[in-house]
Amino acid sequence: MKYETRITRITVGPEGKEIYAPEVTHVEIDDEAAGEFLVLRQNRDDKDSEQTIRIDSDEWPEIVKAVEQLRKGMR
């Protein structure tokens, strides 16, 4: 059997912040036996729960376009 190494989680946050801080976002590849999808997770201030957004790979390009369109209009 041949093995591989995959990166399936990247953590993005302010420099020096703990990985459980509410400002930190975890971007992950997940799979529940129906194909892989992206998950964005953030811990809430109460530290006992998290917020999760699940995104299908086909949906991602349109979400990126929408985010960029709105970001360009920010003041």
For the regions a language model picked out, list residue spans one by one.
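Positively charged, low-complexity terminal tracts
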Residues: 1-75
